[in-house]
Amino acid sequence: MISRLTEKPFVSVSLKMGTVPGGKVMKGTFLVLALAFSTLAAASPNGGPLGDFEAHGDIGSPKIGGYSTWNAASQVYTLSAGGVNIWAKRDEFQFAYRKMKGDFIVQAQVEFQGKGTDPHRKAGVMVRTSIADFDSPYVDGALHGDGLVSLQYRKAKGEDTAQVEMPAAKAATVIQLERRGSLFVLSAARLGEPFEIAQIDNLPNVPEEAFVGLFLSSHNVDVKETVVFRHVRVIKPVKVGFTPYRDYIGSRLEIVNVASGHRNVVYSSKVPFEAPNWLPDGSALLYNASGGDPTSRGRLWRFDIATRLPTLIDTGFAIRNNNDHVLSFDGQQIAISDQSQDKNQSTIYTLPTAGGVPKRITPLTPSYMHGWTPDAKWLIYTGGRIPKGGKDNEYDIYKAASDGSGKEINLTGSPGLDDGPEVSPDGKWIYFNSTRSGQMQIWRMGLDGKNVERVTSDDKWNDWFPHFSPDGKWITIISYGLEVEPSNHPYYKHCMLRIMPTDGSAAPRVIAYIYGGQGTINVPSWSPDGTHVAFVSNSDAL
């Protein structure tokens, strides 16, 4: 729901690569999705011949020349290089780069090809003052052939390289280098685990505008090595001091395979959008636009998988939709949360998925839609209500008949925020997130609000928005670090998209490391065959 501050270790879970945590494929759906993904692979936002990078070349004149390529269909970068090393006073390596000014985030999954000759071959992400000098100041996040991960840097031209080793991240597969003003932060993890962090500050010889990109060095002048970079995300973060719900940056629509963690960007826009819902036939995703001009902002859009084009959905007078919109299980209806009336307070309406005249369901506001029951008779939502004798809204979970009849029924009343309710596909449970323990964690209860049980017990993360796989065996959640206040889920933060069994029998594992948060995955977004999840990440224009 809308933020209340305004208006509103890889653990095995019996899920092996190639298996499907989602159960039975709906008739006709698998073919639609297979064709769709083959089409979507070519839908990357990276427009140039080298994707998000502007050029490539060898630094330091290595004996064996290298190259960099970008495969737009698979969204994969491949680098091949020789080079003595990136160390001491001389660097020799292949570099795919772009010039960037100010803060940035570059994330990549790194895969060396073959066993390699030297255990210290290295690849990763770098920011560098000069591409002409072999002894330039730089900072990099380096993955070595023997699994060593280190934050390496040269403070001044001609000086020796220094490094901070990260033993806890040994054999990492995901590297992320970030600049925050004068601070450089390296995050590294084996896919599935949370990041380990190292950082270095005060490197004045790495200027505000510098060369940023991917690198490879073979660590042997007579050998050429090759590395593949997958899931590369070049991100321009939001400016320091931005005002939430007024200042926005662009959005990327991504789809991740929940078994392998393989993810693709299928659409990107400078006009921000949020919260994708997947149609049951797999043909399209629905989302709301949160920015842009009045003809876009607050409107619902249908993103066609085959054409990769969004079209406007007619929602009548309801043209101030927020990111709490949910399809019925059969896909025939959509319940929206709109702020066009009632003094801009969020109100729940239903209408046909194809568009039409909204029917008001909740007489009381604010109300934020989150779940249908499988029989489409009830809506489950978060409501802000002023308790007897109180002055401020308390946010609890309610249900109301989907035809608008009768009074709403209050299901929770514990101190703190209860939010994000979603009904299991068998109709027996409501999963939700709550701060009743002091942190934001996942809980569940019966449809009558009884038999409340805790699902997650994370002491390092605040967990939000449980979403069920179609067979009800899995949930995805989005997790914030403890630096974020538990009852808040802000925009433009480092988050993790995680998956776990619905019964809590195994710990969550990471399937995507995201720069996003609010609007990333507020509503159900599993593919109908249970193999993929759609979500939104964010970046300003590069």
Question: Where in the sequence are the language-model features?
Answer:
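Compositionally biased, low-complexity segments
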Residues: 8-10, 34
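Extracellular glycan-recognition regions
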Residues: 44-243
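N-terminal hydrophobic targeting signals that begin at the initiator methionine
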Residues: 2, 26-27
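Short, Lys/Arg-enriched N-terminal segments with co-localized hydrophobic residues
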Residues: 14-25
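Sequence signature of WD/YWTD-type beta-propeller architectures
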Residues: 239-542
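Low-complexity, intrinsically disordered segments with a bias for serine/threonine
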Residues: 7, 16-18, 42
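Bacterial N-terminal signal peptides
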Residues: 29-39
